[in-house]
Amino acid sequence: MQNNNFNTTEINNMINFPMYNGRLEPSLAPALIAVAPIAKYLATALAKWAVKQGFAKLKSEIFPGNTPATMDKVRIEVQTLLDQRLQDDRVKILEGEYKGIIDVSKVFTDYVNQSKFETGTANRLFFDTSNQLISRLPQFEIAGYEGVSISLFTQMCTFHLGLLKDGILAGSDWGFAPADKDALICQFNRFVNEYNTRLMVLYSKEFGRLLAKNLNEALNFRNMCSLYVFPFSEAWSLLRYEGTKLENTLSLWNFVGESINNISPNDWKGALYKLLMGAPNQRLNNVKFNYSYFSDTQATIHRENIHGVLPTYNGGPTITGWIGNGRFSGLSFPCSNELEITKIKQEITYNDKGGNFNSIVPAATRNEILTATVPTSADPFFKTADINWKYFSPGLYSGWNIKFDDTVTLKSRVPSIIPSNILKYDDYYIRAVSACPKGVSLAYNHDFLTLTYNKLEYDAPTTQNIIVGFSPDNTKSFYRSNSHYLSTTDDAYVIPALQFSTVSDRSFLEDTPDQATDGSIKFTDTVLGNEAKYSIRLNTGFNTATRYRLIIRFKAPARLAAGIRVRSQNSGNNKLLGGIPVEGNSGWIDYITDSFTFDDLGITTSSTNAFFSIDSDGVNASQQWYLSKLILVKESSFTTQIPLKPYVIVRCPDTFFVSNNSSSTYEQGYNNNYNQNSSSMYDQGYNNSYNPNSGCTCNQDYNNSYNQNSGCTCNQGYNNNYPK
């Protein structure tokens, strides 16, 4: 961990997240890290689950050779990344938990892998394994060590959900009665939502603590979660299906420069996350730095300062991210000439070699506009940045070096050599460059943060940092042309909500990392309606007669009278693909359309542009709905393996919200039923008052307040507080 004290002669770049080499899957984090084999297996399993073998295969990745080697490696890696080390006694407790989980799961998998076995024994061993996992999970939610424990908790949840899925699909061969299978379906959907809630509690606590301490450490933790945690929380809900795709499109950030602390969760939710993201549906085109330096009477350079970062994007004259001598109003578009960046006029002093403070008159201050422009090539993206800032001695010398790819933007003129500091992630590119202002409010403000009005300015000349945002290469295709290109070989294609073609006014960027995407769209407060359109182009040779279905992941906490529509709008051929009646739900829901072909939509050639529209009629200020992603899947390879049928809903009325109408097209519909924590930075109904029995070591489950399925004959071990 680097020294965060800037009154030293240390190089202070705040780059604590290592670069990894190699790649496993184009849609996964490019990391040779402990969780990578697990993620790779899940990506395969989501395409095709090995019935009766899925859990055993997952076990071999999480506990190879019936040892906790992988989990130990996860802990050690994350401890190193975060500089947060578990105490030895806690490590020994976890070792005991791993041993108990390995032993009971090995007994079960060994037994059912025999050519012949008693179904009654298989049934008992299955539920012994499930109950052991449930009862041991609280040991992986470690108060005060949420940063490390979230990565361990995530894999134990993945392990349990894999067991439940195998039980649902293979239960009849393991002695389950129909009522047992129904109960497992109910349990699976409940635990997907409960585990996600508990995971976000861990994340919110650690992220909020680090924001207050130091922004660079908070971003370092966020990077870790983007690789070790959030792709798996996304996989949990996708385990309900076969034929989908696990794709992580979360950004990684590198922070260089002066430390920023005392940031609140509301600051992050307000302006800071928007600054870091830039224009979310556009690639970086160029970035300008408001840079100044000053010299003494002998023309010796003493201080070099970055006062603002102005990125522009390929979609138009957006100025999201402008920091430094800006104004909240009165700035005319386009903001492209140097006259818009005013001279820095505050008095600056320096400590001369005799120990005296001398004023530098404004005339001695030099302002420059330094510009870095992406390459004009077939691959118009920055791949690397070499950015370094150094205090040579407090108050005397400081300097910057800035280089994007092979182009030097700034080479320091201070009297010493600043070493290189290359920022790069394999299989990632630079999509946004920003900075965090000091001494200004970053609180939530709808008026200047809409996605249709990317104008975010601060008068903050004390800014002295640069934040580089890296996006995974799996998003490059969209950002080259602002369209999604579909090939016949794509059995599933993921469209993050922020990769839109157009979006209506009064739409906002919301941070939803558990969806494994760079945010979701929040629609609210409109008279005419809300809409996001997504452009689809078909690659040459595409079979337009292939049948597809479209999965829409959304959340609507308030009742929307007109519901949400899914439409195709192409060359005058407007087709309604589905209508979603929304009565209020605090959790994410998957809506799945009926099948269609592109011929049906009037798209008969690869040269025609198709549009999918997700929209609703107007909503008032007290209403909102969220859109996370679209997943286009081939009907021939797609199956809902864990359905949410009316009879399950009836038995779990306090666990799920879905209409009991048997014709309902909801395919996920889980509702966490936790009270929303109003102080949370996430407007998703997460509640950090969940209180598992951390001291429990016996073979039993939580004392849950869920409605037990009174018709269930399985050995659940739940102690429910609701009447049976």
Swiss-Prot record:
Name of the protein: Pesticidal crystal protein Cry11Ba
Domain of life according to the entry: Bacteria
GO molecular function: toxin activity
Keywords associated with the record: Sporulation, Toxin, Virulence
Miscellaneous section: Toxic segment of the protein is located in the N-terminus.
Chain's role: Promotes colloidosmotic lysis by binding to the midgut epithelial cells of mosquitos. Active on Aedes aegypti, Culex pipiens and Anopheles stephensi larvae.
Gene Ontology terms describing biological process: sporulation resulting in formation of a cellular spore; symbiont-mediated killing of host cell
Statement: the UniProt record of this protein carries the keyword Protein biosynthesis: no
Family: Belongs to the delta endotoxin family.
Keyword Aminoacyl-tRNA synthetase: no
Gene3D superfamilies attached to this UniProt entry: Pesticidal crystal protein, N-terminal domain
The organism of origin for this protein: Bacillus thuringiensis subsp. jegathesan
InterPro entries referenced in this protein's UniProt entry, alphabetically: Pest_crys (IPR038979), Pest_crys_dom_I (IPR005639), Pest_crys_N_sf (IPR036716)
One Pfam family this sequence matches: Endotoxin_N
